[in-house]
């Protein structure tokens, strides 16, 4: 995918369907953010009476015989002193939606004068590119006649030296290939995206990139490894479980290793603790953690980062059936820790627990980061725009938070309240898989933390239940799967681990 280009000269630009012109807002009025020809000023001067330049505001106009582009979009960037990476990202995402609805395929974007801003040309370009790429996406549909919006096919940013712009654009395009993979997997029917399909995608990545190796464990191998928690969740499903291990060696001589774990429940009925219909209808997205890990590995291998990363995906359906695991029963995990089942709808933490145990036994991790659509309690706490995360290591937490703020993928650190751990007490097992009806996201994280046992490994748990999937478009994300987490984690690993 090559979509974005840069060009220093305004006069030498190619003809395009549309032109995007940037504006600041000053004293509640629009102020030009770049110098343009008088021919264009004549087109938009009357429109400025109803256009203030506030962030994300757009005005769609038609050109004339004197303009090279016949469609013109005025784009508000807000007050220059308040512009941030996130506002740039969301503004150009909004512009992309407007352009696609107008059926534009080729677009010229005039780069604003930003010498007075607090961040660099590179940062502005990165967020501009991310905004365009994020909304230049269609989720899979099954209509007889395709009703999807046409894609932008070529976007040229003018006023930027190609050597600078094109390097940033190629990187963002590689990154968004991973984001799109994550979105497509989450958006596709659960009948298609089974555990075996996730394994096939992992194999496909390993076939595409020589730096990746893959290992797939089937049910027999899962039982041989004594992953009794994953095996329990898989008991009721007609589809076979898989335990997927991806390995990326970007720095073979280094002992530093990051393990990424993604919850891969390809459909969650709740098991015998059956979900109500309204809560179940979106449960094809319960494998978003697994999809996030696969998207990260796609980008990681494409960008060739000099780090070592292992990805682990425990994958199964949580189905109902005569063989399904039952509430009140006790199952034993890989390391011998036993769990009393208080709810079969708290299955994600069970399969993640066996994945954590596997990572500690075989991968010698420096840090473990897991991704899971784990708790509705997190959605209640932070909504759909912010993912909560837990960490047992302040450096890891600080670095993730910084990467989050620099990519616009919002994370908020949540507390691991030690005294809440007692809510997991069981009289007949080492623990229950649910606590009380309070602090649900915290007790879920405390459950996972127990499986670190005495290992001092740095660990973070990202509960992406609210951010992975939106039932309406929310900038800078499209409707449905967002791909949240791919950009943040790649940026984290590049900035803090690629040394």
Curated annotation (Swiss-Prot):
<dbReference type="Pfam" id="PF00883">
    <property type="entry name" value="Peptidase_M17"/>
</dbReference>
<dbReference type="GO" id="GO:0006508">
    <property type="term" value="P:proteolysis"/>
</dbReference>
<keyword id="KW-0031">Aminopeptidase</keyword>
<comment type="similarity">
    <text>Belongs to the peptidase M17 family.</text>
</comment>
<feature type="binding site">
    <location>
        <position position="345"/>
    </location>
    <ligand>
        <name>Mn(2+) 1</name>
    </ligand>
</feature>
<protein>
    <recommendedName>
        <fullName>Probable cytosol aminopeptidase</fullName>
        <ecNumber>3.4.11.1</ecNumber>
        <ecNumber>3.4.11.10</ecNumber>
    </recommendedName>
</protein>
<feature type="binding site">
    <location>
        <position position="268"/>
    </location>
    <ligand>
        <name>Mn(2+) 2</name>
    </ligand>
</feature>
<feature type="binding site">
    <location>
        <position position="347"/>
    </location>
    <ligand>
        <name>Mn(2+) 1</name>
    </ligand>
</feature>
<keyword id="KW-0963">Cytoplasm</keyword>
<dbReference type="GO" id="GO:0070006">
    <property type="term" value="F:metalloaminopeptidase activity"/>
</dbReference>
<dbReference type="InterPro" id="IPR023042">
    <property type="entry name" value="Peptidase_M17_leu_NH2_pept"/>
</dbReference>
<feature type="binding site">
    <location>
        <position position="286"/>
    </location>
    <ligand>
        <name>Mn(2+) 2</name>
    </ligand>
</feature>
<keyword id="KW-0378">Hydrolase</keyword>
<feature type="binding site">
    <location>
        <position position="263"/>
    </location>
    <ligand>
        <name>Mn(2+) 2</name>
    </ligand>
</feature>
<feature type="binding site">
    <location>
        <position position="347"/>
    </location>
    <ligand>
        <name>Mn(2+) 2</name>
    </ligand>
</feature>
<keyword id="KW-0479">Metal-binding</keyword>
<keyword id="KW-0645">Protease</keyword>
<keyword id="KW-0464">Manganese</keyword>
<dbReference type="InterPro" id="IPR011356">
    <property type="entry name" value="Leucine_aapep/pepB"/>
</dbReference>
<dbReference type="GO" id="GO:0005737">
    <property type="term" value="C:cytoplasm"/>
</dbReference>
<feature type="active site">
    <location>
        <position position="275"/>
    </location>
</feature>
<dbReference type="Pfam" id="PF02789">
    <property type="entry name" value="Peptidase_M17_N"/>
</dbReference>
<comment type="function">
    <text>Presumably involved in the processing and regular turnover of intracellular proteins. Catalyzes the removal of unsubstituted N-terminal amino acids from various peptides.</text>
</comment>
<feature type="active site">
    <location>
        <position position="349"/>
    </location>
</feature>
<dbReference type="InterPro" id="IPR043472">
    <property type="entry name" value="Macro_dom-like"/>
</dbReference>
<dbReference type="InterPro" id="IPR008283">
    <property type="entry name" value="Peptidase_M17_N"/>
</dbReference>
<dbReference type="InterPro" id="IPR000819">
    <property type="entry name" value="Peptidase_M17_C"/>
</dbReference>
<feature type="binding site">
    <location>
        <position position="268"/>
    </location>
    <ligand>
        <name>Mn(2+) 1</name>
    </ligand>
</feature>
<dbReference type="GO" id="GO:0030145">
    <property type="term" value="F:manganese ion binding"/>
</dbReference>
